[in-house]
């Protein structure tokens, strides 16, 4: 029946209507490799790089100083801020207090919560002064400091020595008195 209906058409039309299976057989079938048809082909493309000139002078001003400057020279000591440089008397003791990079004594103030006040039902706070960078006989330093503070304050103080870290914690004494003690010793 198909042949009889094809006789009606011209030979040119028949060639257009005829179905050829050779093109499908040569091409890869879609279901055999679905990723090949789904993903685009990879092509290498190198990015272009262009260096932009940047003025780093504003950033360099904010960077910390790599080398610690020398101790500043003043006309008289102590300075108006109360700072004094270390003296030769500091080398005569059994212990030594290394100064920080900004040439100040390594004294740090902490505030910690203490006991509950029963009248106000509020916690009292206590100030602890931590002395760091203690080299040498740290217990001799603590004994000298304790006797100096108890003499000036008139009451006993609590202290804690951390020999491994080279730290002393003092409770019940103002930071200013501890600073005066170390300046009087030449540190």
Swiss-Prot record:
Its main location: mitochondrion. The keyword Ribosomal protein applies. InterPro entries: Ribosomal_mL49. One of its GO terms (molecular function) is structural constituent of ribosome. Keywords: Mitochondrion, Ribonucleoprotein, Ribosomal protein. It comes from the Eukaryota. It holds the Pfam family Img2. GO terms for cellular component: mitochondrial large ribosomal subunit. Gene3D superfamilies: SUI1-like domain. One of its GO terms (biological process) is translation. It is found in: Mitochondrion. Belongs to the mitochondrion-specific ribosomal protein mL49 family. This is Large ribosomal subunit protein mL49. The gene is mrpl-49.
């Amino acid at each position: 029946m198909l042949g009889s209906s094809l006789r009606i058409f011209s030979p040119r039309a028949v060639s257009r209507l005829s179905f050829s299976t050779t093109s499908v057989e040569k091409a890869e079938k879609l279901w055999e490799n679905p990723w090949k048809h789904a993903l685009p082909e990879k092509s290498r493309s190198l990015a272009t790089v262009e260096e932009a000139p940047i003025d780093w002078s504003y950033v360099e001003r904010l960077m910390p100083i790599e080398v610690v400057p020398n101790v500043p020279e003043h006309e008289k000591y102590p300075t108006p801020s109360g700072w004094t440089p270390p003296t030769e008397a500091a080398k005569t003791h059994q212990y030594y207090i290394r100064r920080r990079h900004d040439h100040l004594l390594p004294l740090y103030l902490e505030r910690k919560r203490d006991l509950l006040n029963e009248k106000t039902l509020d916690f009292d706070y206590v100030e602890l002064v931590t002395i760091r960078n203690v080299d040498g006989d740290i217990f001799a330093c603590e004994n000298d400091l304790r006797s100096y503070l108890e003499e000036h304050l008139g009451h006993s103080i609590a202290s804690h020595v951390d020999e491994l870290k080279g730290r002393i914690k003092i409770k019940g004494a103002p930071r200013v008195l501890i600073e005066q003690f170390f300046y009087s010793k030449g540190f």
